[in-house]
Design a protein with these regions (language model features):
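Hydrophobic residues within beta-strands of alpha/beta enzymes
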Residues: 49, 197-199
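Conserved protein kinase catalytic-loop anchor
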Residues: 194
């Protein structure tokens, strides 16, 4: 991973694709627009581009609710334009890193739709809980956005945890099958030629065993039970050992 430590002194230019240059004339920024501005970006003296989410998404949270981790949203030009940008950036000596968002997915992701139907092996891909014996929510955690962190699912007849929007169910990273999925996502993009990832809310991926109530925090209730959780370092080391160490890449944690 970064054998020559090329990433130590790099300057990255962040691109929020929707607000960048509109290349196809539909009024929204896209990868064609990025491609057309690669010389300009290089002229700024930067060493690489960091893309905010480009994946297919219903758009409940500006693209951070991902419905497919192995594609590029059609509205941004799809995979064809992404490959052109990647090749063009590399030809100009610039690296390309992407956002990696694996604390949660969109509720429209295939995994979640199968999980709520209890279809193996996806049954425990997310954090599902029944109500407490007294009829209350599984715990008293708050969502980072608003309201409580639990949403009832009529189909499964259980609650699912969402630390962010209701449409962003949290993945169950304690499930080794989920961690394997993450590793396959990493391999997919690294094999394509991406140079690394900015890991979004990565400190939230491990929740305290038992998901206990939070009796101390009056605001952001529950955060001490999932921020820098018990297995964060263990899981990140697993991703590094099994995938990242086999590529010349970089990861940056939020």
């Amino acid at each position: 991973m970064g054998r020559d430590r090329w990433y130590k002194d790099m300057v990255f230019y962040q691109i929020w694709p929707r607000s960048f240059k509109d290349g196809d004339g539909d009024g929204m920024g896209d990868l064609q627009g990025v491609y057309e501005k690669l010389n300009y970006i290089k002229s700024l003296g930067v060493d690489g581009i960091w893309f905010s989410p480009l994946y297919p998404s219903p758009g409940a949270d500006c693209g951070y609710d991902i419905s497919d981790y192995r594609d590029i949203a059609a509205e941004f030009g799809g995979m064809e334009w992404f490959k052109k940008v990647l090749e063009g950036a590399h030809a100009r000596g610039m690296k390309v890193i992407m956002d990696l968002v694996v604390n949660h997915t969109s509720d429209e992701h295939e995994w979640f739709q199968k999980s709520r139907r209890r279809i193996a092996p996806y049954t425990d891909y997310y954090i599902w809980r029944k109500e407490k014996p007294d009829g209350n929510l599984p715990n008293n955690w708050d969502s980072v956005f608003e309201g409580k962190a639990w949403q009832w699912d009529e189909l499964r007849q259980e609650y699912y945890l969402h630390l962010f929007a209701v449409k962003q169910p949290d993945l169950n990273m304690d499930n080794p099958l989920v961690r394997q999925e993450v590793k396959e996502i990493l391999r997919f993009w690294l094999e394509l030629g991406v140079d690394g990832f900015r890991e979004d809310v990565i400190t939230f991926i491990s929740k305290k065993d038992g998901l206990p109530d939070d009796r101390l925090m009056p605001a952001a209730r529950g955060i001490r039970h999932y921020n820098h959780g018990p297995h964060v370092h263990e899981y990140l080391e697993e991703f590094k050992r099994d995938v990242l160490d086999h590529y010349d890449c970089v990861t940056l944690a939020e």
